[in-house]
């Protein structure tokens, strides 16, 4: 467990504590209120991986998935025209958040802040000829039974190795989940 001085709270800008990606994932995992899904397409399941490696993920992760094949993706989320697009990301977040509410609201809705993290990424191909970018977002509640909030990012990846792109996506995703819950009242700190 975390020491008392590391309780999950919004921190004032002047005393913003710098935490490692692993520590941020662990903080989320140890908060019994936060519960959600990770749906990642195109650069592995790097964000979910951080939460599993941090420990305690059973209390946070309802489901992870990667609908890598385009036909599977269309069957799950509906057609979007382009697979790496804001439209596809919003479809993913809406579908996954809807499943959380449909399947778990009666059991956990009054005590859980649900979230659906999603990304769709065009990572570096084998020939290193493609534009590397993606969309990443989270749909989340700030309190149990609360309204939904969305944060959506467009990401350009400049690393010229696939492994480095995957690592960057993983770190950015953890920071997005952490920021959504712990820095939502401090936009400047969230962006840093």
Kindly give the residue locations of the regions a language model identified:
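Short, positively charged and aromatic/hydrophobic N-terminal segments
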Residues: 1-3, 10
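Non-catalytic terminal extensions that flank enzyme cores
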Residues: 9-192
